[in-house]
Design a protein with these regions (language model features):
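Short glycine/acidic-enriched loop and turn motifs that connect beta-strands
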Residues: 64, 113-116, 168, 217-219, ...
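Hydrophobic beta-strand segments that make up the repeating blades of beta-propeller
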Residues: 55-61, 107-112, 161-165, 211-215, ...
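A short loop-to-beta-strand structural motif that recurs across blades of beta-propeller domains
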Residues: 67-69, 118-122, 171-173, 222-224, ...
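Beta-strand-rich domains and repeat architectures in extracellular enzymes and scaffolds
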Residues: 34-64
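Blade-edge motifs of beta-propeller repeat domains
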Residues: 21-39, 70-89, 123-143, 174-193, ...
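Acidic carboxylate motifs that coordinate Ca2+ or other divalent cations, activating on Asp/Glu
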Residues: 52, 56, 102, 106, ...
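Beta-propeller blade termini
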Residues: 42-51, 92-101, 145-155, 196-205, ...
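Gly/Ser/Thr/Pro-enriched helix-cap/hinge segments flanking short amphipathic alpha-helices
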Residues: 33-36, 326, 342-488
């Protein structure tokens, strides 16, 4: 069990971009390879299911029993049978979220059609999960589920559920005291394009969470701007519809959109993992510009996942892209380490050798302060621990954003870290509101630091057309600890 630090918190804004001439090398070590040897995994999702502050890991498979790995100080045990999560159905999506507001992370699982409901909701009671789909009135028996996201759409403290479908209209299930009702048509989110990935964030900084939807098979992407609870597709106007691919064709598309602050200017950028070269849209002025070529990542590829995070604690956000396995070809994976406004591939050989092509998570699974890598794919799935030097691994902050009752139900909240007592921005990250295709987490936000021993943390909560800010000041830097910030 790791030590928690709970603090109360207000706001400040500014930035200073660190320059890096030579990126710190990164390496990862596989753990418990025998345990993670089962093939044909598609989905992973992480959360602390038992309240010990360690991140546990759910892995969904393509027709063999699903697994739930309980994490005890970095050692994993499959407890799926005892927990009630060992269904042997083709699993295409999973997301943890506190559906009933009791403080535990419940689990929504999306299954392939043909053998029962395609959406199943499991209530968590101290690590034991019970099927409550019927009591939640969540009756969906058809549809190719691709991405599920818990988000508080109406800012009432209950987590609502967004579902991206590849073959039917997308859905937004409003949570009213545990009852889930699809209201997507009435609010403008029932898009019928072939959707696979989705992420929510306040892209235009107006106090409402918008949603980026990645679409496949030549369909343009959707970017749905939220205005007073109604959504308008502004992807074309904002330059994000093509995902960096013009023209869109039947063989290309966007699988997973990722949102974060890539260039450390305090504003949200968008990465798109594509069938085709990836895109990197930096927020510039009132819009976004694709700088993938200038940043060195516009190479032909077929990627199922993108993940942002500082893997080497140099203060700059790095990018993991995994290549799909299709048509007998294993497209390459990339670990782009950022240096001097470029992204340079430094993927270790043992990471590249994992046939990962779906779920990917960068999270701190062993509590040392550094980001580890969890992968799924057609071969063995894998958990790879970051081997940063212990002192360097601690040079980060981990921030858990909770409400006034201590519940981790604020997806889309923005966390910024400043050098203590100054307005020098050291890093920014989002509370997970849709990690993208086949991956999700309820986990502390991680920000790596190149310098600074003490920091100020500020949390911006977009809700109801306002951007409420809270802060924690003069926090000692130690990534082994979790700083809990309570927001309204």
């Amino acid at each position: 069990m790791h030590r928690n630090l709970t603090l109360s918190v207000g706001l400040i804004v500014a930035s200073l971009w660190p320059l890096h001439s030579q990126p710190t090398a990164v390496s990862f070590r596989a753990v418990q390879s025998e345990l993670f040897a089962a093939p044909n995994s598609l989905v992973n999702a992480a959360a602390d299911i038992d309240g010990d502050t360690d991140l546990d890991l759910f892995v969904g498979f393509n027709g063999t029993p699903n697994r739930l790995y309980r994490n005890d100080g970095g050692t994993f045990t499959d407890v799926a049978v005892a927990a009630g999560l060992n269904a042997a159905r083709a699993t295409r999506a999973a997301a943890f979220g506190d559906w009933d507001g009791d403080g535990d992370s419940d689990l929504l699982v999306g299954y392939a059609p043909g053998s029962g409901p395609v959406l199943t909701l499991y209530r968590n009671d101290r690590g034991v999960f019970t099927d409550v789909t019927s009591s939640a009135r969540l009756a969906v028996d058809a549809g190719a589920v691709r991405q599920v996201v818990w988000v508080d759409y109406d800012d009432d403290g209950d987590l609502d559920l967004f579902v991206a479908f590849r073959d039917r209209a997308n859905a937004l299930f409003l949570n009213d005291a545990g009852t889930l009702t699809d209201i997507a048509t009435s609010i403008g989110l029932a898009d019928t394009r072939r959707s696979v990935g989705a992420v929510w964030a306040d892209l235009d900084a107006d106090g409402d969470l918008d949603v980026v939807v990645g679409n496949m098979d030549g369909d343009a992407n959707g970017v749905f701007r939220n205005h007073n609870g109604r959504f308008t597709d502004v992807a074309e106007a904002w330059g994000l519809a093509s995902g960096g691919q013009t023209p869109r064709t039947a063989v290309n598309g966007t699988v997973r959109p990722c949102v974060g602050d890539v260039n450390n200017d305090g504003r949200l950028d968008v990465v798109m993992a594509n069938y085709g070269p990836p895109a990197l849209f930096l927020r510039q002025g009132d819009g976004w510009s694709d700088v993938a070529s200038a940043w060195g990542i516009a190479v032909d590829s077929r990627s199922d996942a993108c993940v942002l995070g500082d893997v080497n604690h140099d203060g700059a956000v790095d990018l993991y892209l995994n290549g799909t396995v299709t048509g007998g070809r294993n497209w390459p994976d990339y670990l782009y380490v950022q240096t001097s406004n470029r992204l340079v591939d430094q993927i270790p050989q043992n990471v590249a050798a994992v046939p990962a092509d779906h779920g990917a998570l960068l999270l701190d699974f062993n509590g040392d302060g550094a980001l580890d890598l969890a992968l799924t794919g057609q071969g063995p799935h894998a958990l790879l621990v970051n081997t940063l030097d212990a002192a360097l691994a601690r040079h980060s902050v981990r921030v858990q954003v909770v409400d006034s009752r201590g519940r981790a139900n604020k997806p889309g909240a923005e966390v910024r870290v400043y050098r203590a007592g100054t307005r020098q921005l050291l890093g920014m990250a989002l509370v997970d509101a849709g990690s993208g295709y086949n991956a999700q987490s309820v986990a502390p936000v991680h920000i790596g630091l190149a310098s600074a021993n003490r920091v100020d943390i500020e949390v911006t909560l977009p809700a109801g057309g306002k951007r409420e800010v809270t802060y924690a000041r003069n926090i000692q830097v130690d990534g082994r600890r979790i700083t809990t910030v309570k927001v309204p």
